[in-house]
Amino acid sequence: MKKILTTFGVALALTATMSAGYDGEGRKDLQVFNDISKAVTRYAQFTIFDSVDASVKDGVVTLTGRVTMPYKKDAIEKRVTGIDGVKVVHDQIAVLPVSQFDDQLRHRIARAIYSNPNFWNHAIMADPPVHIVVEHSRVTLTGVVQSDVERMVARSIAGSQFGVMSVVNNLKTDAEVKEALEKTF
């Protein structure tokens, strides 16, 4: 049976999907997946400007996404490699190019989003759920929000910042995450 677990977005908004039935081995992959999620989100250097996704199949882990510094890529891979049940890690995490303009844009977007009243409750979290990845002035929003309104507001705020060339909105709502999890089981 083919089993695939994947995440949607950084804060590692954890949704797991399987293309076949659920058995003991699938449970093991789900446990590994949950451990990966915890390891990544508890990494102190993992910020709202990084986005990492993981997939697990029979203990083989594939990491994808983008981080702001090379040491983060290495540290995340090392953390995942040490998890019980992980056989092999394929690290496909990309390191974003160094750009002072992109750095300034990241911070402007983060300030604008988290100073909006719709996101005040998220701003005080240790790992806020909206992650902002900027590469060559192109913005990708990832993570989980509470509603479609929050998703649209975040996209609107990001797109209204000076210097933004495009916005890809990969934010998921709590309901979408819940629905994906229910389909899994």
Language model features with spans:
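N-terminal targeting leaders
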Residues: 2-10, 14-185
